[in-house]
Amino acid sequence: MDWKGRDVISIRDFSKEDIETVLATAERLERELKEKGQLEYAKGKILATLFFEPSTRTRLSFESAMHRLGGAVIGFAEASTSSVKKGESLRDTIKTVEQYCDVIVIRHPKEGAARLAAEVAEVPVINAGDGSNQHPTQTLLDLYTIKKEFGRIDGLKIGLLGDLKYGRTVHSLAEALTFYDVELYLISPELLRMPRHIVEELREKGMKVVETTTLEDVIGKLDVLYVTRIQKERFPDEQEYLKVKGSYQVNLKVLEKAKDELRIMHPLPRVDEIHPEVDNTKHAIYFRQVFNGVPVRMALLALVLGVI
Amino acid sequence: MDWKGRDVISIRDFSKEDIETVLATAERLERELKEKGQLEYAKGKILATLFFEPSTRTRLSFESAMHRLGGAVIGFAEASTSSVKKGESLRDTIKTVEQYCDVIVIRHPKEGAARLAAEVAEVPVINAGDGSNQHPTQTLLDLYTIKKEFGRIDGLKIGLLGDLKYGRTVHSLAEALTFYDVELYLISPELLRMPRHIVEELREKGMKVVETTTLEDVIGKLDVLYVTRIQKERFPDEQEYLKVKGSYQVNLKVLEKAKDELRIMHPLPRVDEIHPEVDNTKHAIYFRQVFNGVPVRMALLALVLGVI
Amino acid sequence: MDWKGRDVISIRDFSKEDIETVLATAERLERELKEKGQLEYAKGKILATLFFEPSTRTRLSFESAMHRLGGAVIGFAEASTSSVKKGESLRDTIKTVEQYCDVIVIRHPKEGAARLAAEVAEVPVINAGDGSNQHPTQTLLDLYTIKKEFGRIDGLKIGLLGDLKYGRTVHSLAEALTFYDVELYLISPELLRMPRHIVEELREKGMKVVETTTLEDVIGKLDVLYVTRIQKERFPDEQEYLKVKGSYQVNLKVLEKAKDELRIMHPLPRVDEIHPEVDNTKHAIYFRQVFNGVPVRMALLALVLGVI
């Protein structure tokens, strides 16, 4: 697989070998950065971050990654300051901006926008989210985090908790995990179960999948608990939401039954699905997970720029 | 002419020698950048981009140019995030910001703002548009593009198409072209003809100027067709606009009569005055023209910073 | 005092030795920058500027300082483009952003926000204003300016003019000046006198403090006149404001009685409390004062990053 010039649009475009390449490159870059303090792989290169809708954490993570590689950044943080307002097509905007840079990171409210940008641009395009919150770099940093914490992904028992129906983050992660030998525990209220076709796909690929509505029943088995925000606005009935909400908050009491090695992850931002009291336990790794976004994005930038 | 510390406010301040210096410096920097990948002329220098009104493409082009020279960038993309809101005068804002940087690029909705900024500031000021869309760097990149495509400007037949009445871009380009031995074809609907005083000025300076309302009549003669956006909002009558619009769209049919060497330019953004089907023809160079903005702005920055 | 990793939240946290360290480091960095053109103390380091409310001059000053040190900058200029909108706590935002950077500069509308950020973050946090316009770097650059102009602070007669009641900038400056042997002249309308408890505190610390409502009476004695904006909106009565306003404008007439060495300072932005005609006199140093913000912020960044 030639990485130079490659677009990164969906995790579905990645083979297991691709994923392993990204994880190994991220590990190497993280180590080199720690040793040397400053890398110069992307010296003289320019990243354009085109955020047609705001997403501070994702934008700052990519910009940090580019700077850590010694490169420069241009771009915009929201569409209101972009020339999109003048009625220009996305196609023309991309054809224009690519003249100013070596790689594009795009975030766009419309599904398919990143794919279109990739088709139009000659420089590589990385999808930082289009239409939903799903984006391939989140899944890659999730996998990187699991591997870094346990030294492996194979053999782990991984629980996904929360909104498994609409949450694209957990859909992508579950699909990517089929490359590995893991047991998957899907923990959600009835209303928010993982769609049937995804569960079937996971099982067809040989994955052991357990579904439950009660975290307490499975917490003792898990190596990883991946928590997602339950989005209140999805619920037709406020009372229904409130009942569900309480039963799913991860707090110290729930964790009494957890294994010592349990790691709790979250793509953030969180609202109340993890109580702040959990932050100081050895289980909480969600801020380390945030940190891991930087080496993973460094790896992707270095690979598609062809500088590593 | 000493370039170090010079302000770049209007193309009218430029002699032919000045223009040639910019074009030659741009050519040199473009070549050096290609050979070395990274230049360091502006290492340790800071550009402040003060965009009192948004203009993403112009801002990103300047920022890219500064980074390509190895320099750094600070600034703001729109006035709402600037301290202008606190009732500070433009004069004080400029006197303040110049303490933080080595060169200023300013875009401002009020005509004369860039000239005022230049008078106030001790660091050099480059006008990225004030009051109208005219700005000298557009004209310079237009000239650079023509020279790069043909190896010369003299002897060419250049058509300007569209709104020649209000379009400052074409006014500036036409005036700058009087330094060269070109034939100018002014193609526009009656309502949007080039103002009489400009046409007279061009002819007084010895330029051959032909005016027409019909692109088809002259397309076969042209080496360059410079297309501008016809701004719908200028027309008192929607029907009149629609009739005009159709007759002026550059598409494959119109291009059947064009010379092989014809190059089509556009300052962008475009709306529908060039059909996307033209993009893949050998005639379309408007995205290369966008790219040329970078070496031209690199040249200006390096010259006024006195680092080349 | 170990500076590496230290937070800079309030000038009240600073000993005289701390202040002297910052001033000496700023002087050294300003000299080195002049000699070498470009410093690399912060090469490979990343500053995150988190401006939850806009403050262009402060943000650009910090960003300039970081670039002058050879470092990189990420961040946002106003809260609307940040993920705060998704209901995330400030605590989580800080814990997240610190994963992307080596030092944080924060500006926040709520008092106490910077202190909270400092408690949460493992990277050093510098307060660029929270709740009021007071921030420690303003006071430090004011002291640096006085020392640079006179070679010393001890022995000077310093006047503070304007809104001494609400103006936190002058409160902080007055408090910091108790470390030095200065005479302080508090010049304000009756309604805007310095709060009693501050005046008493100053006197208890041995400072000679003179209060007056009439600039003309004391202008001839002063070495420094520090002017602040009188904020119209504080006045219950427009007529009262207008009367006060006129009597306090610093203009050429008022300056007739001033000593030759008088230096006029202002934290800016100004509205009309200093007439523009004063700008070109030898007394006006408020734009040099702006410039001094850069070496002072360079010093703070270098110190808390532990790179000097």
UniProtKB/Swiss-Prot annotation, chains A, B, C:
<feature type="binding site">
    <location>
        <position position="57"/>
    </location>
    <ligand>
        <name>carbamoyl phosphate</name>
    </ligand>
</feature>
<dbReference type="InterPro" id="IPR002082">
    <property type="entry name" value="Asp_carbamoyltransf"/>
</dbReference>
<feature type="binding site">
    <location>
        <position position="135"/>
    </location>
    <ligand>
        <name>carbamoyl phosphate</name>
    </ligand>
</feature>
<feature type="binding site">
    <location>
        <position position="168"/>
    </location>
    <ligand>
        <name>L-aspartate</name>
    </ligand>
</feature>
<feature type="binding site">
    <location>
        <position position="58"/>
    </location>
    <ligand>
        <name>carbamoyl phosphate</name>
    </ligand>
</feature>
<feature type="binding site">
    <location>
        <position position="86"/>
    </location>
    <ligand>
        <name>L-aspartate</name>
    </ligand>
</feature>
<feature type="binding site">
    <location>
        <position position="268"/>
    </location>
    <ligand>
        <name>carbamoyl phosphate</name>
    </ligand>
</feature>
<keyword id="KW-0665">Pyrimidine biosynthesis</keyword>
<dbReference type="GO" id="GO:0004070">
    <property type="term" value="F:aspartate carbamoyltransferase activity"/>
</dbReference>
<dbReference type="InterPro" id="IPR006131">
    <property type="entry name" value="Asp_carbamoyltransf_Asp/Orn-bd"/>
</dbReference>
<dbReference type="Pfam" id="PF02729">
    <property type="entry name" value="OTCace_N"/>
</dbReference>
<comment type="function">
    <text>Catalyzes the condensation of carbamoyl phosphate and aspartate to form carbamoyl aspartate and inorganic phosphate, the committed step in the de novo pyrimidine nucleotide biosynthesis pathway.</text>
</comment>
<feature type="binding site">
    <location>
        <position position="269"/>
    </location>
    <ligand>
        <name>carbamoyl phosphate</name>
    </ligand>
</feature>
<dbReference type="InterPro" id="IPR036901">
    <property type="entry name" value="Asp/Orn_carbamoylTrfase_sf"/>
</dbReference>
<dbReference type="GO" id="GO:0006207">
    <property type="term" value="P:'de novo' pyrimidine nucleobase biosynthetic process"/>
</dbReference>
<feature type="binding site">
    <location>
        <position position="107"/>
    </location>
    <ligand>
        <name>carbamoyl phosphate</name>
    </ligand>
</feature>
<dbReference type="Pfam" id="PF00185">
    <property type="entry name" value="OTCace"/>
</dbReference>
<dbReference type="InterPro" id="IPR006130">
    <property type="entry name" value="Asp/Orn_carbamoylTrfase"/>
</dbReference>
<feature type="binding site">
    <location>
        <position position="138"/>
    </location>
    <ligand>
        <name>carbamoyl phosphate</name>
    </ligand>
</feature>
<dbReference type="InterPro" id="IPR006132">
    <property type="entry name" value="Asp/Orn_carbamoyltranf_P-bd"/>
</dbReference>
<dbReference type="GO" id="GO:0044205">
    <property type="term" value="P:'de novo' UMP biosynthetic process"/>
</dbReference>
<protein>
    <recommendedName>
        <fullName>Aspartate carbamoyltransferase catalytic subunit</fullName>
        <ecNumber>2.1.3.2</ecNumber>
    </recommendedName>
</protein>
<dbReference type="GO" id="GO:0016597">
    <property type="term" value="F:amino acid binding"/>
</dbReference>
<comment type="similarity">
    <text>Belongs to the aspartate/ornithine carbamoyltransferase superfamily. ATCase family.</text>
</comment>
<dbReference type="GO" id="GO:0006520">
    <property type="term" value="P:amino acid metabolic process"/>
</dbReference>
<feature type="binding site">
    <location>
        <position position="229"/>
    </location>
    <ligand>
        <name>L-aspartate</name>
    </ligand>
</feature>
<keyword id="KW-0808">Transferase</keyword>
<comment type="subunit">
    <text>Heterooligomer of catalytic and regulatory chains.</text>
</comment>
<comment type="pathway">
    <text>Pyrimidine metabolism; UMP biosynthesis via de novo pathway; (S)-dihydroorotate from bicarbonate: step 2/3.</text>
</comment>
